[in-house]
Amino acid sequence: MIDVAYKIVEKLPDGSYKFLFHDRKISFRLSDMLVAKNKMGYEAYNKDGSKKMYLTGIHVIETLELCLKYLKYFKRKDNKAIIFCDVMHVRKKPDGRAGVMLADTIILREEIFIP
């Protein structure tokens, strides 16, 4: 099943994009399909000291409104863009902020906002 979501990215001078945090060496363009390197990761620790494990994915945000809210946390906004994406195999990120999801596959459709 294909859903829609949004992704905040860094916009490069040549018009391509990069992830903000992980896999920053990878650049991509609109209409590209990106597939997550699914592996087990951890976000934090349980009270007993054990790691909270989860299946990783590509971070996406459920709504444009939440993207705009999260964009405010970045000091530099002039090189950011919000991309409308088709997303597949989406799940809530454990212990993530509201609306933050993990997708196994995203297709970058349209740049809808440049701050």
What are these regions (language model features)?
Residues 1-58, 64-115:
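Conserved NAD+-utilizing ADP-ribose enzyme module
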